[in-house]
From Swiss-Prot:
Belongs to the RNase Z family. Its cofactor is Zn(2+). It comes from the Bacteria. It holds the Pfam family Lactamase_B_2. GO terms for molecular function: 3'-tRNA processing endoribonuclease activity; zinc ion binding. This is Ribonuclease Z. InterPro entries: Metallo-B-lactamas, RibonucZ/Hydroxyglut_hydro, RNase_Z/BN. The active site is at D66. CDD domains: RNaseZ_ZiPD-like_MBL-fold. Disulfide bonds: none annotated. Its EC number is 3.1.26.11. Zinc phosphodiesterase, which displays some tRNA 3'-processing endonuclease activity. Probably involved in tRNA maturation, by removing a 3'-trailer from precursor tRNA. It catalyses: Endonucleolytic cleavage of RNA, removing extra 3' nucleotides from tRNA precursor, generating 3' termini of tRNAs. A 3'-hydroxy group is left at the tRNA terminus and a 5'-phosphoryl group is left at the trailer molecule.
Length: 314
């Protein structure tokens, strides 16, 4: 699981930061999932090492332009590039109507299937490898945060040990990998736990934007390996944050701390914190780190490989 930040500015792009978008790369299944798609996201994809041909799912938090204005252009370009794979899009009410209007007035026709899912609190996607749940956040328009949960996996299977015990290869290996008990024709019994390394605990990622501090963000971030949380304002601008229902750096840190998360990335920075401004982003990092030390500032094209868990590190 690799996270790539494609846009880390709020409201409008700056010279060094595009508006909101985060990509999650799942190399074991050759897929990319996108979270928000602000204007210019397809340009950011082209500048990154990611392949838009692997795009399979897009999760939209809310209907503000800095989170959706790049969506139609990206989908149209995928079609022009010859994409044939279905893309599933998840988001709040109004998203499907927005895309339908864009298609109708621009006379855009897709050569591949698109499925739009209007989300409700709870699970929005699951398969044998991952699940995604959403919860309402506290913003000026309906907004949802997302939690990506990787399913637990058995530890590495010791094939050499199984061979040395005279266990024939085939379906019995699969049963042992799943932790089951098997009995051979000669009466010997073996337990899967004796042939597998430490269990790999599924990794968790929380994506919370746009929102002020709220209990739902804490629950989405509970025990997360990575929390990606908006930090539009510094603590000095807390009154403005309450007025506009955005988070300060300290609010984001309080979410991560209350949730028992392992790492926090701040993103969605107001352009007022541009280089050479009176208050810089380093100040936001200092504020957050005083509460939650494992905090980093996200920047465009930052890649982060989410480390695997085992029973000893969970």
């Amino acid at each position: 699981m690799q996270i790539t930040f494609l846009g880390t500015s709020s409201g409008v792009p700056t010279r060094s930061r595009n508006v909101s978008s985060v990509a999650l790369r799942l190399p074991q299944r050759a897929e990319i999932w996108l979270f928000d798609c602000g204007e210019g996201t397809q340009h950011q994809l082209l500048r990154s090492e990611l392949k838009s041909s692997q795009l399979r799912r897009i999760f939209i938090t809310h209907m503000h332009g800095d989170h959706i204005f790049g969506l139609m252009g990206l989908l149209a370009s995928c079609g022009l590039a010859g994409n044939t794979e279905r893309i599933d899009i998840y988001g709040p009410a109004g998203l499907e109507e927005y895309l339908q209007a864009c298609r109708r007035y621009s006379q855009t026709h897709f050569s591949y299937p698109i499925q739009v899912h209007t989300v409700q609190p709870g699970e929005v996607f699951s398969d044998q490898d991952y699940s995604v749940v959403c919860a309402p956040l506290k913003h000026r328009v309906p907004a949802f945060g997302y939690r990506i949960q990787e399913c637990d996996r058995p530890g590495r299977f010791d094939t050499d040990k199984a061979i040395s015990m005279g266990i024939p290869a085939g379906p019995l290996y699969g049963r042992l990998k799943r932790g089951e008990r098997i009995t051979l024709p000669d009466g010997r019994t073996f337990f899967g736990q004796d042939f597998c390394g430490p269990k790999e605990i599924g990794r968790k990622i929380a994506y919370c934007t746009d929102t002020i501090y709220c209990p739902e963000a804490v629950e989405l971030s509970r025990d997360a390996d990575v929390v990606i949380h908006e930090s539009t304002f510094s603590h000095q601008e807390a009154e403005l944050a309450y007025q506009r229902l955005h988070s300060t750096s300290t609010m984001a840190a309080q979410v991560a701390q209350a949730a028992g998360a392992k790492k926090l990335f701040l993103t969605h920075f107001s352009p007022r914190y541009a280089p050479n401004s009176a208050t810089g982003l380093q100040e936001l990092l200092t504020e957050a780190s005083a509460i939650f030390p494992h905090t980093e500032l996200a920047y465009d094209f930052l890649n982060y490989q989410v480390p695997r868990r085992t029973l000893t590190t969970a």
